[in-house]
């Protein structure tokens, strides 16, 4: 099916589904419609396991939004559909770059829509149905609608012709829905990937493809041996500092008695924030030292051991915070904030696990970002599939 056919079908679907209809249910149906249409328009050789998984999650997310109609379910539908579309078109593009592609296409619509040759394919012989539709329906209908509104301002009786009729037709609503449908159809089916994005994709591989130069230090004022030693000393000192913090942190959480619920709430959130900030900084430090050569440096064994110990200690810190949050929930009930604490702590723990794998398997820093992208997507799906407010 040609691109402009897909756009017109999308416009028609938006008008039919959303004209004076309930948004949540019909948006779910629209999501299922786009998922199936994307599946049928994707080449069979590109329907790999990831694509099929995204197809299933798109269907489930659409059902979830039709049932719950909340913001998280809408986000899940939006992300799932565009991931499905991008994956079926550019499967070798790293998922982290899908965000950049989407943002560029969302805001470049006005510039690209006037490049008609990009999205409207002329028929080779004779007149196609789309050509006939544009000639006899779309263009005349557009002019009639514009002048209808012009004349409506000059005569109340003329304006009430449709308003007072049994058809109860609202042309303005149809036009707005058509514009929205065209915008959605255009950015969904006619998205472009710039050349610089393909160049960025080369730098986001999970594995090192070139021979890494171990003799090139990060800073000019430090040689490679000094940098290795500084990393070991830094991580060793941080391990000692973190060990002391873990002991004091757990003592304050599990042995000190809090006088009021408000005080306990404030202390819990402050400690969780400290844990999350500690995890982020820990991962950044490890990414700095293991960005290139030290992944393959035989002399960096002690540095790797120190980094793994630091990851384990940070993991212990996360587990302590999870246990304390569970205790807090059992005493004062479940709220969205406390569920949010679980979400952030879970993501922090997943980040530590992937950081450990990165060091163990000698992966690039991009490996961590690629995996965390899918982990974040999985978190959105979990949040959208369950009615947490009803628990």
Go through the PLM ranges and name each one.
Residues 124, 129, 134, 170-185, ...:
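Hydrophobic alpha-helical transmembrane segments
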Residues 381-391:
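Hydrophobic alpha-helical transmembrane segments in integral membrane proteins
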Residues 309, 314-358:
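Membrane-embedded alpha-helical segments of integral membrane proteins
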Residues 1-37, 300, 308, 314-320, ...:
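Alpha-helical transmembrane segments and their cytosolic membrane-interface
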Residues 15-156, 177-201:
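Transmembrane-helix bundle segments that line or gate the permeation/cavity pathway
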Residues 164-178, 261-277, 334-345:
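Short aromatic-rich membrane-water interface segments that cap or initiate transmembrane helices
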Residues 1-3, 44-47, 116-131, 160, ...:
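Juxtamembrane membrane-water interface segments of multi-pass membrane proteins
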Residues 146-161, 244-259, 319-327, 390-391:
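Membrane-helix interface motif
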């Amino acid at each position: 099916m040609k691109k402009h056919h897909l756009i017109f079908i999308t416009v028609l679907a938006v008008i039919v589904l959303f004209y004076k209809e309930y948004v949540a249910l019909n948006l779910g149906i629209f999501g299922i419609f786009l998922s199936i249409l994307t599946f049928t328009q994707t080449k069979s050789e590109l329907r790999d396991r990831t694509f099929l998984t995204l197809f299933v999650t798109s269907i489930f997310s659409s059902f979830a939004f039709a049932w719950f109609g909340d913001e998280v379910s809408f986000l899940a539908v939006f992300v799932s559909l565009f991931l499905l579309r991008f994956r079926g078109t550019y499967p070798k593009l790293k998922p982290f770059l899908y965000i950049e592609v989407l943002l560029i296409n969302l805001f470049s619509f006005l510039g690209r829509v006037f490049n008609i040759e990009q999205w409207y394919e002329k028929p080779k012989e004779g007149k196609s149905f789309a050509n006939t539709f544009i000639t006899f329906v779309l263009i005349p209908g557009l002019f009639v609608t514009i002048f209808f509104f012009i004349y409506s301002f000059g005569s109340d009786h003329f304006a009430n012709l449709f308003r007072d009729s049994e058809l109860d037709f609202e042309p303005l609503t149809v036009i707005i829905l058509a514009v929205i449908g065209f915008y959605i159809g255009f950015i969904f089916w006619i998205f472009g990937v710039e050349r610089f994005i393909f160049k960025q994709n080369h730098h986001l591989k999970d594995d090192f493809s070139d021979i890494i130069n171990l003799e090139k230090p990060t800073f000019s004022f430090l040689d490679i041996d000094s940098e290795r030693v500084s990393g070991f000393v830094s991580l060793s000192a941080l391990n000692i500092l973190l060990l002391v913090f873990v002991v004091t942190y757990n003592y304050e959480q599990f042995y000190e008695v809090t006088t009021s619920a408000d005080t306990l709430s404030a202390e819990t959130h402050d400690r969780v924030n400290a844990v999350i900030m500690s995890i982020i900084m820990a991962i950044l430090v490890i990414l700095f030292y293991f960005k290139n050569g030290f992944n393959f440096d035989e002399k960096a064994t002690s540095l790797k051991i120190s980094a793994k110990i630091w990851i384990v200690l940070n993991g212990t810190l996360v587990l302590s915070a999870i246990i304390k949050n569970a205790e807090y929930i059992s005493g004062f009930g479940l709220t969205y904030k406390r569920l949010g604490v679980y979400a952030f702590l879970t993501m922090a723990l997943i980040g530590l696990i992937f950081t450990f794998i990165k060091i163990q398997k000698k992966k690039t820093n991009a490996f961590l970002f690629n995996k965390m992208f899918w982990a974040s997507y999985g978190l959105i799906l979990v949040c959208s599939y369950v009615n947490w407010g009803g628990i």
